[in-house]
Amino acid sequence: MKAGAVESGEISKGAPPRKGLIRGLSIMDFILRIVAAIATLGSALGMGTTRQTLPFSTQFVKFRAVFSDVPTFVFFVTSNSIVCGYLVLSLVLSFFHIVRSAAVKSRVLQVFLDTVMYGLLTTGASAATAIVYEAHYGNSNTNWFPFCRQYNHFCKQISGSLIGSFIAVVLFIILILMSAISISKH
């Protein structure tokens, strides 16, 4: 038997994980957090500034649509704002992981918090998507008529704000997977 060979039943203690891989994942984590923060901020601002008044409003009756008229849209703006704030604050921890790539406990905490924020972001985006779908297509079973034919600008803006939120959802999945890989390499 060769001197360097491993017998069956023995555990090989190969070379420790390269710091370059973990550091590269940490740098990518930092960049993805910035992109996700921009996406959630854009979604919150896009939905939060949505309003339209129809041109045939009278002096006493105004036909207008505002995001705050729908509680689901308020939840969407709130959840995106909370997640954006978290992402900005987590940049400090992400930078710490670039400097100290051997930190494991803080990575576990970050994976836990990322998962919580992923859940919050997904619920806000999914709930808003259901309402946007109803606004575009209505529901004939409940006699809810689509109102996007009248409020065209309003519907375009609320539909567009969903895009940034779902981009952030995908980025959170990538962030969680990258953090898990980073932890497993220690």
Curated annotation (Swiss-Prot):
It is found in: Cell membrane. The keyword Cell membrane applies. The chain crosses the membrane at residues 27-47, 73-93, 111-131, 163-183. One of its GO terms (biological process) is cell-cell junction assembly. One of its GO terms (cellular component) is plasma membrane. Residues 48-72, 132-162 are extracellular. Pfam families: CASP_dom (PF04535). It is a multi-pass membrane protein. Keywords: Cell membrane, Cell wall biogenesis/degradation, Membrane, Transmembrane, Transmembrane helix. Residues 1-26, 94-110, 184-186 are cytoplasmic. Regulates membrane-cell wall junctions and localized cell wall deposition. Required for establishment of the Casparian strip membrane domain (CSD) and the subsequent formation of Casparian strips, a cell wall modification of the root endodermis that determines an apoplastic barrier between the intraorganismal apoplasm and the extraorganismal apoplasm and prevents lateral diffusion. Belongs to the Casparian strip membrane proteins (CASP) family. PANTHER family: CASP-LIKE PROTEIN, CASP-LIKE PROTEIN 1U1. Homodimer and heterodimers. This is CASP-like protein 6. It comes from Glycine max.
